[in-house]
């Protein structure tokens, strides 16, 4: 939760504070862990896990026998699947979804960061960045965009903007302009479907 003091701080001297989810509520524990479940240093990115009275004990019935769901709660800790970091004041910053992270050329790349940069290009409506299997890189950063009605944007404009705005290893290897995106049951862009479609080409 962001406190009144956090809002004041964010509006006067530290605007990044307002991009955080704030501090854990009373009775809620939050940790940032690596793949082995060990805490990462302050400021480093890892999976967000949480414990407290708000966390379920497990799943009822048949779902409780399914390892794909039971692995979410382990030893009382809910493994959220979100990637984030804690600052020195224990504020939580969410970075991306763990399943969306791209590993390319040995680098961990967070699609949301690239999507936010591409969204700055005038005329871009929606953006989806995914990692596509690649023999050379492991995964290839690929960006798909839809445009606002009447907008005239080409792939090279987007590539040039990325080149000027981010580290070289994060830049998309390919930018595609599409008419629409497949959506999941909650109305969000279905990145898994996009990834599968691209890899099937």
What are these regions (language model features)?
Residues 1-91, 98-101, 114-115, 150:
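Conserved AMP-binding/adenylate-forming
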Residues 36, 52, 57-58, 76, ...:
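AMP-binding/adenylate-forming catalytic core of the ANL superfamily
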Residues 175-178:
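General small-molecule cofactor/ligand-binding pocket signal
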Residues 198-201:
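A short, polar/charged loop-to-alpha-helix boundary motif
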